[in-house]
Regions:
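Glycine-rich, mobile lid/loop segments that gate access to catalytic sites or pores
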Residues: 108, 113-147, 152-158, 169-176
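Short glycine/serine/threonine-rich phosphate/pyrophosphate-binding segments
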Residues: 57-59, 139, 144-151, 210-214, ...
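An N-cap/entry alpha-helix motif that binds or orients negatively charged groups
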Residues: 8-40
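Hydrophobic alpha-helical bundle architecture
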Residues: 215-231, 235, 239-243, 251-253
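Phosphate/pyrophosphate-binding betaalpha-module
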Residues: 137, 148-212
Length: 253
């Protein structure tokens, strides 16, 4: 904890009003703690975007068909997405990793989305994709209908009402939103909410890209790499690790 404390002291003793930099101060202290550097660096920042397709898409829970996932991946690779511009501007190394897009997971409103073996394989892919020389890791995803999977995971984990946690995703109208809520409720009723491990809930309600995100988070923790998670889908996947330990995501923001 010494680099963290020293960074706190440096910020405290700087010629400026106390706390005037807001959360930037907290971010610098957090980075210093995980990197074990008084002056944390962002010289080798990586962004990993995982893509996967979901069988539950056949239930009409998204405004777009599943083949849009592959189209978006191609757009990423051509440099045509917002994340490409952000990474270019900030000198971040971007990797887009599609995972078996031609083989969607199964419809989890009727059966488990994946077997444990394929779930662990996706987690291993995410684990292996983290470069040990990285000093800050950004994680993102792409997958038509993965807001449905993320909401199902979050509601199962935190025992929350589905209506309160379900959004319009890529732009559902009221009728399709009601259908999405109904599909998630059916899945939770079918599978229950008492999951004993991250891999079991990911296998039942998740997707390959969500499992890969979890694998990357585990690798980053072991390598002391701080992680930035992009949005609800990433954080829902990450939250599965709290089944083990509430502090296991301390290296993530």
């Amino acid at each position: 904890h010494q680099p963290r404390r020293q960074r706190q002291m440096c910020i405290r003793d700087s010629t400026k009003p106390q706390g005037s930099l807001g959360r930037v101060e907290d971010f610098a202290i957090w980075m210093a703690g995980w990197q074990k550097k008084i002056n944390p660096t962002m010289d080798n920042t990586h962004c990993l975007i995982y893509a996967g397709n979901h069988g539950v898409a056949t239930q009409g829970v998204s405004a777009y068909p599943s083949d849009v996932t592959a189209q978006m991946v191609e757009n990423f690779k051509r440099g045509g997405a917002a994340i490409n511009q952000i990474c270019k501007l900030a000198n971040i190394q971007l990797s887009v990793i599609p995972i078996d897009l031609e083989y969607p997971t199964r419809d989890f409103s009727k059966e488990a989305a994946m077997g444990l073996e394929e779930t662990i394989a996706a987690m291993q892919l995410g684990f292996d994709s983290v470069n040990q020389d990285c000093d800050l890791l950004l994680l993102g995803e792409m997958g038509i209908s993965n807001t449905t999977a993320a909401t199902a995971i979050a509601c199962a984990l935190f025992k929350q009402p589905v209506e309160a946690w379900t959004g319009i995703g890529t732009g559902l109208d009221e009728k399709r939103l009601a259908n999405k809520i109904s599909v998630i409720k059916s899945a939770i009723e079918l599978h229950g909410q008492n999951f004993k491990s991250p891999e079991s809930i990911l296998a039942t309600l998740g997707g390959r890209e969500l499992a890969a995100i979890v694998g990357s988070i585990i690798a980053a923790r072991l390598l002391r790499i701080p992680v930035l998670l992009d949005g609800f889908i990433c954080t829902s996947a990450a939250a599965t690790l709290t089944i083990f330990d509430n502090k296991i995501l301390d290296h993530c923001l």
